[in-house]
């Protein structure tokens, strides 16, 4: 295994109508281009650095088309075969100079199929009509780069908000910043009642939707909205908006510079190989052990390729056999479902899956005294019922504004959670906790309950 580079524009551009490709830019990913015909191209995703297992994220630019030239692009080497492309509710994104914002490619121009010409692999093909020779960019989902985040954080810092503070938590292996954002209207107040909310995102570099949601969260928290002002008074927010800057910069899908899935390193992180995970884990445990602070919630933001909508994953702990504890775990999912049409209680789940061991949610759930969740949002689309009252469901593509709107809805749900915690809001749950458990977790919970009962009887 080794690093495979991205394609670059040739030194000499051929005659107009001969497309040329470029991915040697921040977060770019396209390892090879094979010209099948004058209008069709096979495109090969570059694998993650030092890890050939992951080939999902792509982000490239092409130019030199003739006016109204048609082209078909085939992504031929996806490592993840089962995605929402198979269900017809997924679309890559495109951006041109004429329209300087990302848009979804129309579904009628997208095909996902098994190809006998490619060893019976699943191929994603999409057609596009170029309006001019100017560059056009294509990506798996709406990009959010490390450089883009740094420019935005610099701008936020320049506003001189008294409640906003930016620190360098640690540097990555390639010496990029891992930023720690603190948002708190009363930063000097630690008198036994300080409630803490911890948020992280982008441990998987290809999951750009999580950054757009985090962008929406932070922009709402620093806004003049009355609800944002109240949130800043009742909570201290500690936010790490990008856990894997090296992977994001390199255009990886899952891994860090060294080929590690950082979301499997939380149990025993290395201070030199996984510096962001090492530093964040220490930060979380430090505040959780501080008697003057009360850690309430930790949420790690991700993106999902095999399900639509957004939803939460939670943990099943020993305390989950207590009705009061399980009831409180369900508050945030229900509050978010009330505020956001794209939130799915159907996909919300509390699990103990072995393959999730070592993740932030599972590891910190074992170490911390607070509620720990993963917030997942689809790369592509969400299903929702229309307002006609007929129960008709529609599928709507996610665009940047909708990801950011989810961030705002999440903040509002946190405020409602605070009110419920203080007895100012009543939450009625129609579904018991066990209905949010997969079959395997239900068996685990029953075993835990029996052990608790046996322990009580022996006393």
UniProtKB/Swiss-Prot annotation:
Tissue expression as described in the entry: Expressed in labial and amphid neurons.
UniProt KW Mitochondrion keyword: no
Purpose: Metallocarboxypeptidase that catalyzes the removing of polyglutamate side chains that are present on the gamma-carboxyl group of glutamate residues of tubulin in sensory cilia. Probably via the deglutamylation of tubulin, promotes microtubule stability required for axon regrowth after injury. Also regulates microtubule dynamics in uterine muscle cells.
Taxon lineage: Eukaryota, Metazoa, Ecdysozoa, Nematoda, Chromadorea
Catalytic activities: (L-glutamyl)(n+1)-gamma-L-glutamyl-L-glutamyl-[protein] + H2O = (L-glutamyl)(n)-gamma-L-glutamyl-L-glutamyl-[protein] + L-glutamate
Residues given in the record as Zn(2+) binding sites: 204, 207, 302
Family matches, as PROSITE patterns: PEPTIDASE_M14
Catalytic residues, chain numbering: 376
Cofactor: Zn(2+)
Organism: Caenorhabditis elegans
Name of the protein in its database record: Cytosolic carboxypeptidase 6
Comment on bound cofactor: Binds 1 zinc ion per subunit.
GO CC aspect terms: ciliary basal body; cytoplasm; microtubule cytoskeleton
Positions of transmembrane segments: none
SUPFAM superfamilies for this protein: Zn-dependent exopeptidases
Pfam families: Pepdidase_M14_N, Peptidase_M14
Null allele phenotype: RNAi-mediated knockdown at the L1 or L4 larval stages or in the egg-laying apparatus causes a reduction in egg-laying due to a defect in the egg-laying apparatus muscles.
Protein origin, superkingdom: Eukaryota
Biological processes annotated in GO: egg-laying behavior; protein deglutamylation; proteolysis
Subcellular location: Cytoplasm
Domain annotation Peptidase M14: ranges: 142-418
Protein family according to the UniProt entry: Belongs to the peptidase M14 family.
Record keywords: Carboxypeptidase, Cytoplasm, Hydrolase, Metal-binding, Metalloprotease, Protease, Zinc
């Amino acid at each position: 295994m080794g690093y495979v580079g991205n394609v670059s524009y040739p030194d000499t551009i051929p005659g107009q109508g001969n497309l040329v490709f470029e991915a040697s830019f921040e977060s770019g990913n396209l390892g090879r281009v094979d010209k099948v015909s004058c209008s069709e191209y096979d495109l090969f995703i570059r694998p993650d650095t030092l890890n050939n297992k992951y080939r999902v994220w792509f982000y490239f630019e092409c130019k030199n088309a003739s006016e109204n030239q048609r082209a078909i692009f085939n992504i031929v080497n996806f490592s993840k075969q089962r995605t929402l492309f198979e269900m017809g509710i997924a679309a890559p994104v495109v951006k041109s100079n004429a329209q300087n914002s990302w848009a979804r490619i129309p579904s009628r121009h997208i095909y996902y199929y098994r190809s006998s010409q490619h060893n019976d692999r699943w191929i994603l093909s999409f057609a596009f009509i170029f309006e001019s020779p100017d560059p056009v960019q294509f990506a798996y989902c709406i990009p959010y780069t490390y450089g883009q985040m740094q420019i935005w954080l610099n701008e936020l810092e320049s506003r001189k908000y008294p409640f906003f503070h930016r620190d360098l938590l640690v540097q990555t292996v390639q010496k990029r910043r891992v930023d720690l954002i603190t948002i708190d209207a009363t930063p000097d107040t630690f008198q036994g009642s300080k409630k803490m909310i911890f948020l992280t995102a982008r441990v998987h570099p290809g999951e750009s939707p999580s950054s757009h949601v985090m962008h929406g969260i932070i922009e709402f928290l620093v806004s003049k909205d009355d609800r944002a002002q109240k949130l800043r008074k009742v909570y201290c927010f500690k936010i790490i908006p990008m856990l894997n800057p090296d992977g994001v910069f390199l255009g990886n899908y899952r891994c860090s510079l060294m080929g590690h899935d950082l979301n499997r390193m939380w149990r025993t992180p290395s201070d030199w190989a996984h510096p962001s995970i090492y530093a964040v884990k220490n930060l979380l445990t430090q505040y959780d052990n501080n008697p003057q602070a009360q850690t309430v919630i930790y949420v790690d933001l991700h993106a999902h390729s095999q399900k639509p909508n957004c939803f939460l994953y939670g943990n099943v702990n020993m305390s989950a056999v207590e009705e009061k504890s399980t009831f409180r775990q369900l508050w945030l999912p229900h509050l978010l479902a009330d505020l956001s049409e794209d939130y799915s209680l159907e996909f919300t789940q509390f699990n103990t899956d072995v393959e999730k061991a070592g993740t932030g949610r599972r590891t910190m759930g074992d170490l911390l005294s607070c509620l720990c969740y993963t917030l997942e949002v689809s790369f592509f689309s969400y299903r929702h019922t229309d307002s006609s009252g007929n129960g008709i469901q529609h599928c709507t593509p996610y665009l940047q504004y909708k990801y950011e709107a989810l961030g705002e809805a999440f903040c509002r749900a946190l405020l409602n959670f605070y009110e419920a915690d203080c007895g100012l809001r009543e939450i009625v749950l129609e579904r018991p906790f066990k209905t949010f458990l997969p079959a395997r977790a239900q068996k685990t919970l029953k075993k835990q309950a029996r052990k608790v009962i046996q322990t009580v009887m022996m006393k």
